[in-house]
């Protein structure tokens, strides 16, 4: 059950971090450059998107901390790479981002996904599980 909690927390972290990236990109692309902040009134929707993205990053961090409690670092950390694929797919698919698919980007993201799958593949020889809260005999 602890491993399931870890996987769910890692999934939550990936989804929230991906949403944060997209929200930050959408909001920041609609705000003036910092040197023009004094002379312009920023778009409220853009400010809200950036604020929500920052909140999503904070929630993602909390999920990440929960994932680290239940998963080995090497396994959990590789799962964060799934957000690269998710952000790429969504940014290129959604018209709000004006991003495009390309062969080289798709190949690169495919390699990242292959790496995540490789790191998280089940091992054939079961190694004894070690959990930091359990004391060794």
From Swiss-Prot:
GO terms for molecular function: carbohydrate derivative transmembrane transporter activity; transmembrane transporter activity. Disulfide bonds: none annotated. Its main location: membrane. InterPro entries: Flippase_ArnF, Small_drug/metabolite_transptr. Residues 25-44, 98-100 are periplasmic. It comes from the Bacteria. Pathway: Bacterial outer membrane biogenesis; lipopolysaccharide biosynthesis. It is found in: Cell inner membrane. The chain crosses the membrane at residues 4-24, 45-65, 77-97, 101-121. Residues 1-3, 66-76, 122-137 are cytoplasmic. SUPFAM superfamilies: Multidrug resistance efflux transporter EmrE (SSF103481). GO terms for cellular component: plasma membrane. GO terms for biological process: lipid A biosynthetic process; lipopolysaccharide biosynthetic process; transmembrane transport. Heterodimer of ArnE and ArnF. Belongs to the ArnF family. Translocates 4-amino-4-deoxy-L-arabinose-phosphoundecaprenol (alpha-L-Ara4N-phosphoundecaprenol) from the cytoplasmic to the periplasmic side of the inner membrane. HAMAP family: Flippase_ArnF. This is Probable 4-amino-4-deoxy-L-arabinose-phosphoundecaprenol flippase subunit ArnF. It comes from Pseudomonas aeruginosa (strain ATCC 15692 / DSM 22644 / CIP 104116 / JCM 14847 / LMG 12228 / 1C / PRS 101 / PAO1). The lineage of its organism: Bacteria, Pseudomonadati, Pseudomonadota, Gammaproteobacteria, Pseudomonadales. The gene is arnF.
């Amino acid at each position: 059950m602890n491993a399931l909690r870890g996987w769910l927390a890692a999934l939550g972290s990936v989804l929230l971090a991906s949403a944060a990236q997209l929200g930050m990109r959408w909001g920041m692309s609609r705000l003036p450059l910092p040197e023009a902040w004094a002379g312009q009134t920023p778009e409220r929707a853009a400010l809200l998107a950036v604020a929500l993205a920052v909140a999503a990053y904070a929630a993602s961090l909390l999920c990440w901390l929960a994932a680290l409690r239940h998963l080995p670092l090497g396994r959990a950390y590789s799962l964060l790479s799934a957000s690269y694929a998710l952000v790429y797919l969504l940014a290129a698919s959604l018209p709000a981002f004006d991003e495009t698919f390309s062969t080289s980007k798709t190949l690169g993201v495919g390699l990242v996904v292959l790496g995540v799958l490789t790191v998280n593949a089940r091992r054939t020889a079961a190694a004894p599980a070690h959990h930091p809260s359990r004391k060794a005999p």
